[in-house]
Amino acid sequence: PTQLPAIGKDGNAQITKIAYGFDGTFDGDGHTISGIYHTENGNNAEGKYNALFGCIDKNGVVKNIVFSENNHITSYNYVGSIASLNMGTIENCSNYADITATNFAAGGICGFMVNGNGTVKDCHNYGNVTAMTYASGICGGSQSGKSITTYSYLIEDCTNSGNLSTSNGLGSAGIAGSYSGAIRNCTNSGNVDDTQGTAKSKQYTAGIVSCASNAVDIEGCTNSGSINGVKNLGGIVGNVMKGDEAATAISNCVNNGAVSGQDLYVAGIVGNSARAEGLVSVVKCTNNGEVTSTGTSEFIGNLRGNTTIALGDGNVIGTGLKVLPLDPTDPTGISDVNINKTADGVFLRNGKIVIVKNNKEYTVGGVQMVEK
């Protein structure tokens, strides 16, 4: 079949300079779209930015579409069913087709959100998603870096039941891959597997977000899929990366899936935050899934895989789960000791949370971080 050009795609489009993005409203009214074929997957203009829409611009709205399993989407990078690149709003869309990126970033709904803007809400993915790196049920990831001054990315009320995997073992997650922004009330029931491939560093595997950066806020999310990877993996978040000094909060989330690793930083909620510059907190979260690792006897926990992750109030470890090395021994799971500025860690002093990171000391009120 002939490859159908994506709507809003320019042959010279780049992620940093997007031309001719769709800026109107497309209402599918619940109708089903079938027969879309994208099979060009080389590192060229034909192999990039392929989906139903190549790019949705800031004012663009695409909604009420069912993307059937009788579509074929295989492309080089930023691959999705509804959109390759999204700066606008995708709402109430469902995908049943399998999505494949031969290189970077595949999502069941959209490939990547860019330029600090983009919303995906009330969308559902049922297809399997694969990529070389970063395969996710809803969105492959979002653009970050010095050029982005405000992060207004949002994924809300979305579900994934497709299976996720990468060919080099890096970055699979149920909802989003490399991501900066907010994720609220999302659910993953698909199985996540990053154990295959040839990459030396197989990591960043999770039920909701594989790799978070720049003040991610994850609230009210649930994972019930099995999580299989090597290191930096969690039932909710795999790894929190270096970003700004704003706080990253994971709250009111539940993991019911088994989490199985082969190396360091394996946990039921958040695997690792060693490279984060701001406070990473876990509050009112529950882990009911068994957590195991064949390669570590130290950096493994039912809630966290690293002591740099602060455990707030209301966290619950499911009845019958084995006690792991990084499980809390007090209600907050925060050490009540004197501060040693030469060592990183999270402490409780005079009723306040204190985090020492990169030889800097911070006190935290709520989610606000103030350098002393």
Predicted feature residues:
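C-terminal outer-membrane/trafficking sorting elements
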Residues: T332-K372
